[in-house]
Amino acid sequence: MTKEFHHVTVLLHETVDMLDIKPDGIYVDATLGGSGHSAYLLSKLGEEGHLYCFDQDQKAIDNAQVTLKSYIDKGQVTFIKDNFRHLKARLTALGVDEIDGILYDLGVSSPQLDERERGFSYKQDAPLDMRMDRQSLLTAYEVVNTYPFNDLVKIFFKYGEDKFSKQIARKIEQARAIKPIETTTELAELIKAAKPAKELKKKGHPAKQIFQAIRIEVNDELGAADESIQEAMELLALDGRISVITFHSLEDRLTKQLFKEASTVDVPKGLPLIPEDMKPKFELVSRKPILPSHSELAANKRAHSAKLRVAKKIRK
């Protein structure tokens, strides 16, 4: 891993081991990031195995071309610079219509959070950006300075689950009427000013949920995850598996619901036999989410909210 792209991989062994890797299998890392999961997965593949890695951040791919060089030289890795919502189209274009496993590590990678100018963090002063793909058009600046009051309230409440969404949106509306809100620090201070004093005494930064909400809006994170996970489940071969790491309740709720719909069947009571075409195509590998160990939590504070869910395809 290059010094410029330092990232501690969360739930490394659990996520990959749960895929039950076949040495000659075709696998996908939908969120390359710091390439930790990819490196471990590749170590389990034989010469016939192949890994396709998606990331919309060119820096992540540049880093992986260094850290995964030995596997690249053997022709075992293909990088795809794109949003994982285009998973099926990009793989089909490469002649891949079936995969043996796929993993997702949702959310922002550590390097993106730590890179000040990306504007993801409320802890560092930076321009309001928050784009995972630097070539996309919508930025946090546009959301904060141009979205109508009602749209801001909706986004803050839906994606940030912040009960002071109206007060925060009103404070933003008042401030931007005087001059544009340009930096993360300006925004964080406005959020703090909109909240009651007793709220500011609670654990955690008062701007965390609102920054999350804006980031999700800028990158359409939930929409992309929904589309991509469904496409991944279609692409999986029989006995293929999907591992999804989430970091907040919205991502986890989405993943849980998709897996539930695919692993259960809604049939009338009293039906003696379930028709074959109505039987669920998936089963849950673990009924409850897999959480980081105590040792991982002690070593990596960013792992504290991580949850891993895994499903297996049992019917085509």
Swiss-Prot record:
SUPFAM superfamilies: Putative methyltransferase TM0872, insert domain, S-adenosyl-L-methionine-dependent methyltransferases. Its EC number is 2.1.1.199. GO terms for molecular function: rRNA (cytosine-N4-)-methyltransferase activity. It comes from the Bacteria. The keyword Cytoplasm applies. The keyword S-adenosyl-L-methionine applies. Keywords: Cytoplasm, Methyltransferase, rRNA processing, S-adenosyl-L-methionine, Transferase. One of its GO terms (biological process) is rRNA base methylation. S-adenosyl-L-methionine binds at residues 35-37, 55, 84, 105, 112. Transmembrane segments: none annotated. It is found in: Cytoplasm. It catalyses: cytidine(1402) in 16S rRNA + S-adenosyl-L-methionine = N(4)-methylcytidine(1402) in 16S rRNA + S-adenosyl-L-homocysteine + H(+). InterPro entries: RsmH, SAM-dep_MeTrfase_MraW_recog, SAM-dependent_MTases_sf. One of its GO terms (cellular component) is cytoplasm. Gene3D superfamilies: Putative methyltransferase TM0872, insert domain, Vaccinia Virus protein VP39. Its main location: cytoplasm. Specifically methylates the N4 position of cytidine in position 1402 (C1402) of 16S rRNA. Belongs to the methyltransferase superfamily. RsmH family. This is Ribosomal RNA small subunit methyltransferase H. The gene is rsmH.
